[in-house]
């Protein structure tokens, strides 16, 4: 059976299991995580990405100087539309 090509995703989720044989030699066995571990890893990464997006949004919000109510409304609507669009496509 052919081994799939390594990608950053598979490299980051692979684990090497080193075992000592009876004669003292060490053997390495590459273990791929099961689907539950892979999904947990994926969800953890995506949660970190989402938190980063939210943090960046609020930093921009707090950096506004003397905004008017209308400029805030316009800015919030633009950012909200952009955020939702990116959230569904990525």
From Swiss-Prot:
Residues 1-39 are annotated as: Disordered. It holds the Pfam family PB1-F2. The record marks 66 as: Low pathogenicity. GO terms for biological process: symbiont-mediated perturbation of host apoptosis; symbiont-mediated suppression of host cytoplasmic pattern recognition receptor signaling pathway via inhibition of MAVS activity. Residues 7-16, 24-39 have a biased composition (Polar residues). The keyword Membrane applies. It comes from the Viruses. Its main location: host cell. Transmembrane segments: none annotated. GO terms for cellular component: host cell cytosol; host cell mitochondrial inner membrane; host cell nucleus; membrane. Residues 65-87 are annotated as: Mitochondrial targeting sequence. It is found in: Host mitochondrion inner membrane; Host nucleus; Host cytoplasm, Host cytosol. Disulfide bonds: none annotated. Keywords: Apoptosis, Host cytoplasm, Host membrane, Host mitochondrion, Host mitochondrion inner membrane, Host nucleus, Host-virus interaction, Inhibition of host innate immune response by virus, Inhibition of host MAVS by virus, Inhibition of host RLR pathway by virus, Membrane, Modulation of host cell apoptosis by virus, Viral immunoevasion. Is not encoded in all strains, and seems to be dispensable for replication. Oligomer. Interacts with human SLC25A6/ANT3 and VDAC1. Interacts with host MAVS. Belongs to the influenza viruses PB1-F2 family. This is Protein PB1-F2. It comes from Influenza A virus (strain A/Chicken/Pennsylvania/1370/1983 H5N2). The lineage of its organism: Viruses, Riboviria, Orthornavirae, Negarnaviricota, Polyploviricotina.
């Amino acid at each position: 059976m052919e081994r799939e090509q390594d990608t950053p995703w598979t490299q980051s989720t692979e684990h090497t299991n080193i075992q000592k044989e009876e004669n003292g030699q060490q053997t390495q066995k590459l273990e791929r995580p099961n689907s539950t571990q892979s999904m947990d890893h994926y969800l953890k990464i995506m949660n970190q990405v989402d938190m980063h997006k939210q943090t960046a949004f609020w930093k921009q919000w707090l950096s506004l100087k003397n905004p008017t109510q209308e400029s805030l409304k316009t800015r919030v609507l633009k950012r909200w539309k952009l955020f939702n669009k990116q959230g569904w496509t990525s």
